[in-house]
Protein backbone atom coordinates (compact mmCIF):
# COMPACT_ATOMS: atom_id res chain seq x y z
CA UNK A 1 0.00 0.00 0.00
CA UNK A 2 1.59 3.25 -1.09
CA UNK A 3 2.95 5.49 1.63
CA UNK A 4 3.19 2.76 4.28
CA UNK A 5 6.67 2.02 5.52
CA UNK A 6 5.86 -0.54 8.18
CA UNK A 7 3.93 -3.80 7.86
CA UNK A 8 1.82 -2.92 10.91
CA UNK A 9 0.86 0.42 9.33
CA UNK A 10 -0.14 -1.42 6.16
CA UNK A 11 -2.32 -3.67 8.32
CA UNK A 12 -4.14 -0.65 9.74
CA UNK A 13 -4.77 0.75 6.27
CA UNK A 14 -6.05 -2.62 5.07
CA UNK A 15 -8.30 -2.83 8.14
CA UNK A 16 -9.94 0.45 7.11
CA UNK A 17 -10.41 -0.87 3.58
CA UNK A 18 -11.91 -4.07 5.00
CA UNK A 19 -14.31 -2.12 7.24
CA UNK A 20 -15.47 -0.10 4.24
CA UNK A 21 -16.00 -3.24 2.15
CA UNK A 22 -17.90 -5.01 4.93
CA UNK A 23 -20.22 -2.02 5.25
CA UNK A 24 -21.26 -2.49 1.60
CA UNK A 25 -21.08 -6.25 1.09
CA UNK A 26 -22.58 -9.28 2.81
CA UNK A 27 -20.35 -10.86 5.43
CA UNK A 28 -18.38 -13.84 4.09
CA UNK A 29 -19.02 -17.36 5.37
CA UNK A 30 -15.27 -17.94 5.82
CA UNK A 31 -12.00 -16.10 5.23
CA UNK A 32 -8.77 -17.35 3.65
CA UNK A 33 -5.46 -15.65 4.35
CA UNK A 34 -2.30 -15.91 2.31
CA UNK A 35 0.65 -16.23 4.70
CA UNK A 36 4.19 -16.43 3.36
CA UNK A 37 5.84 -18.70 5.90
CA UNK A 38 4.14 -21.66 7.54
CA UNK A 39 7.32 -23.31 8.78
CA UNK A 40 7.00 -27.04 8.28
CA UNK A 41 3.26 -26.92 7.60
CA UNK A 42 2.29 -28.48 4.29
CA UNK A 43 -1.46 -27.80 4.40
CA UNK A 44 -3.81 -24.93 5.23
CA UNK A 45 -4.56 -24.46 8.92
CA UNK A 46 -7.39 -22.91 10.92
CA UNK A 47 -6.26 -19.63 12.47
CA UNK A 48 -6.37 -19.45 16.24
CA UNK A 49 -4.18 -18.03 19.03
CA UNK A 50 -1.75 -20.97 19.02
CA UNK A 51 -1.19 -20.81 15.25
CA UNK A 52 -0.74 -17.03 15.37
CA UNK A 53 1.95 -17.41 18.07
CA UNK A 54 3.69 -20.05 15.97
CA UNK A 55 3.57 -17.94 12.80
CA UNK A 56 4.84 -14.87 14.66
CA UNK A 57 8.03 -16.78 15.53
CA UNK A 58 8.68 -17.08 11.77
CA UNK A 59 8.50 -13.32 11.14
CA UNK A 60 12.28 -13.03 10.79
CA UNK A 61 12.05 -15.33 7.75
CA UNK A 62 9.60 -13.01 5.97
CA UNK A 63 9.87 -9.67 7.81
CA UNK A 64 8.01 -7.61 5.21
CA UNK A 65 5.11 -10.02 4.75
CA UNK A 66 4.56 -12.15 7.86
CA UNK A 67 3.79 -9.33 10.37
CA UNK A 68 1.41 -7.65 7.91
CA UNK A 69 -0.41 -10.91 7.19
CA UNK A 70 -0.81 -11.57 10.91
CA UNK A 71 -2.05 -8.00 11.50
CA UNK A 72 -4.67 -8.48 8.79
CA UNK A 73 -5.71 -11.86 10.20
CA UNK A 74 -6.09 -10.20 13.61
CA UNK A 75 -8.22 -7.41 12.13
CA UNK A 76 -10.42 -9.88 10.27
CA UNK A 77 -10.81 -11.90 13.47
CA UNK A 78 -12.04 -8.81 15.30
CA UNK A 79 -14.33 -7.66 12.48
CA UNK A 80 -15.70 -11.11 11.61
CA UNK A 81 -15.43 -13.14 14.82
CA UNK A 82 -17.96 -15.75 13.65
CA UNK A 83 -16.29 -16.44 10.29
CA UNK A 84 -13.81 -19.33 10.26
CA UNK A 85 -10.38 -18.14 9.14
CA UNK A 86 -7.84 -20.37 7.39
CA UNK A 87 -4.19 -19.63 6.63
CA UNK A 88 -2.77 -20.89 3.33
CA UNK A 89 1.02 -20.86 3.23
CA UNK A 90 3.35 -20.07 0.35
CA UNK A 91 5.74 -22.61 1.89
CA UNK A 92 3.13 -25.36 1.44
CA UNK A 93 3.51 -25.18 -2.34
CA UNK A 94 7.09 -26.39 -1.97
CA UNK A 95 6.83 -28.51 1.17
CA UNK A 96 7.18 -31.73 -0.79
CA UNK A 97 10.30 -30.83 -2.74
CA UNK A 98 12.55 -33.88 -3.04
CA UNK A 99 15.63 -33.71 -0.77
CA UNK A 100 17.94 -32.97 -3.70
CA UNK A 101 15.89 -29.87 -4.54
CA UNK A 102 15.24 -28.74 -0.95
CA UNK A 103 18.78 -29.17 0.37
CA UNK A 104 21.39 -26.42 0.16
CA UNK A 105 24.93 -27.41 -0.78
CA UNK A 106 26.28 -26.81 2.73
CA UNK A 107 28.42 -28.93 5.04
CA UNK A 108 26.44 -31.77 6.65
CA UNK A 109 27.27 -30.44 10.12
CA UNK A 110 25.59 -27.15 9.34
CA UNK A 111 22.52 -28.89 7.95
CA UNK A 112 22.31 -31.07 11.06
CA UNK A 113 22.65 -28.05 13.35
CA UNK A 114 20.29 -25.68 11.53
CA UNK A 115 17.08 -26.73 9.74
CA UNK A 116 17.98 -24.97 6.50
CA UNK A 117 16.03 -25.81 3.37
CA UNK A 118 14.79 -24.25 0.17
CA UNK A 119 11.16 -23.26 0.23
CA UNK A 120 10.85 -22.41 -3.46
CA UNK A 121 10.55 -18.64 -3.25
CA UNK A 122 13.11 -15.82 -3.24
CA UNK A 123 15.87 -18.25 -4.14
Go through each PLM region and give its residues.
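Short, contiguous clusters of charged residues that form electrostatic/catalytic patches at enzyme active sites
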Residues: 16-19, 70-74, 87, 123
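Short beta-strand-loop/turn "lid" adjacent to the catalytic site in phosphate-handling enzymes
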Residues: 25-66, 84-86, 92-104
